[in-house]
Amino acid sequence: MKTLLLTLVVVTIVCLDLGYTLTCLNCPEVFCKKFQTCRNGEKICFKKFDERKLFGKRYRRGCAATCPEAKPREIVQCCSTDRCNR
């Protein structure tokens, strides 16, 4: 009986969702390899860049609670899965 109870406790702990933390890219380069673990409440990954520049685009990537607004001539892309803001 104790073995069954212990097994049920272990299975319950393993199956519990102990919280999910989103991971987003966070760097200004086109080919970004730096990751950031988002803070509690940040459920969005974003990527911003200036649409006017063909070469040397400066990207801004990171985590956010909501999708940031685009400024004039700026493109913003948002998503909500791990490392989706490539």
Swiss-Prot record:
Under the heading Gene3D superfamilies, the entry gives: CD59 (2.10.60.10)
Please name the InterPro entries in this protein's record: Snake_3FTx, Snake_toxin-like_sf, Snake_toxin_con_site, Toxin_cobra-type
Q: Which Pfam families match?
A: Toxin_cobra-type
Disulfide topology:
C24-C45, C27-C32, C38-C63, C67-C78, C79-C84
Key word Signal present in the record?
yes
For this UniProt record, give its keywords in alphabetical order, as a comma-separated list. Answer: Acetylcholine receptor inhibiting toxin, Disulfide bond, Ion channel impairing toxin, Neurotoxin, Postsynaptic neurotoxin, Secreted, Signal, Toxin
Instruction: Answer yes or no on keyword Secreted.
Output: yes
Record family assignment = Belongs to the three-finger toxin family. Ancestral subfamily. Orphan group II sub-subfamily.
Query: What's this chain's function?
Result: Binds with low affinity to muscular (alpha-1-beta-1-delta-epsilon/CHRNA1-CHRNB1-CHRND-CHRNE) and very low affinity to neuronal (alpha-7/CHRNA7) nicotinic acetylcholine receptor (nAChR).
Q: What is the protein named? A: Weak neurotoxin 10
What species is given as this protein's source? Naja sputatrix (Malayan spitting cobra)
